[in-house]
Amino acid sequence: MASLKEMRNRISSVKATQKITKAMQMVAAAKLRRSQDAAESARPYARRLASVIANLAAGVSGDGAPKLLAGTGRDDRHLVVVAAADRGLAGGFTSSIVRAARAHIDGLIAQGKDVRVVCVGKKVTAQLAKPYAGRIVETFDLSSYRQLTLSVAQPIADVITREYEAGETDVVTLFYSRFKSVVQQIPTGLQLIPAVVETGEAASGPTAVYEYEPSEEAILETLLPRNLTVQILSALLDNMAGFYASQMTAMDNATRNAGDMIKRYTLEYNRSRQAQITKELIEIISGAEAV
């Protein structure tokens, strides 16, 4: 059985850990608010851009459609971009994204598809480096960026465009965590190329006839690469909000668990101390009676 001194040291150690986890929880909560605001602020622009592209795509014929929209007509070669956190202490945030991505990748490989992988985030690279060592074409470390902007997403978009234009891939899918609420982040696979145009994105209500100058095809050639970067940035912003939400929850659970341990250790300490005092009293009384 541990001595009273060891028990006191154990309690002090857990209390120190509890202070750290509580501080990390508060920091994560503050960063979550900023990240959530950034993610929500980016959505109107992304939705409006998608709506414009949907309207333009409706007037483009199959042969004249840009390659990013029409695709190659095959699905033999796939590029899978997996984006998650660069840091840990956030529960299973990164693991859930990687698990969804691996299920997709393994399914494609089982079908005989040629699969290549782009890792965004140190934790993603660490988890995918071994199982897909020969398939990783690029890795990105975003830990040095204080703020996520289009300039951060652009290099990732450039790699995707390079692989696609070089004929190395037919389909590009991005895996990330869609931020729905503080308690719900959903691992999501988003097809980037060929661009998925939702018919519901087009403006509703009475339709007007527009004459475009330059042509719809020329405008799409400019907007589609821009939309690719915007989609990646939106995913990264969702990831950041989801990461801090997961970290806040994980640190809250750790703080609560530390509190439970402190109560349990304190109870054990008090019982041991009481037993020791009782033993000493018995020895004193026994000695007095012997005299």
Swiss-Prot record:
GO cellular component entries: plasma membrane; proton-transporting ATP synthase complex
SUPFAM superfamilies: ATP synthase (F1-ATPase), gamma subunit
Membrane topology summary: Peripheral membrane protein
CDD domains named in the record: F1-ATPase_gamma
GO biological process, one term: proton motive force-driven plasma membrane ATP synthesis
Gene Ontology MF terms: ATP binding; proton-transporting ATP synthase activity, rotational mechanism
Residues annotated as signal peptide: none
Main location: membrane
Keyword Ion transport among UniProt keywords: yes
Keywords from the named record: ATP synthesis, Cell inner membrane, Cell membrane, CF(1), Hydrogen ion transport, Ion transport, Membrane, Transport
Subcellular location: Cell inner membrane
InterPro entries on file: ATP_synth_F1_ATPase_gsu, ATP_synth_F1_gsu, ATP_synth_F1_gsu_CS
Subunit structure: F-type ATPases have 2 components, CF(1) - the catalytic core - and CF(0) - the membrane proton channel. CF(1) has five subunits: alpha(3), beta(3), gamma(1), delta(1), epsilon(1). CF(0) has three main subunits: a, b and c.
Protein family: Belongs to the ATPase gamma chain family.
Function field: Produces ATP from ADP in the presence of a proton gradient across the membrane. The gamma chain is believed to be important in regulating ATPase activity and the flow of protons through the CF(0) complex.
Name of this protein: ATP synthase gamma chain
Organism: Caulobacter vibrioides (strain NA1000 / CB15N) (Caulobacter crescentus)
Lineage, opening ranks: Bacteria, Pseudomonadati, Pseudomonadota, Alphaproteobacteria, Caulobacterales
UniProt gene name: atpG
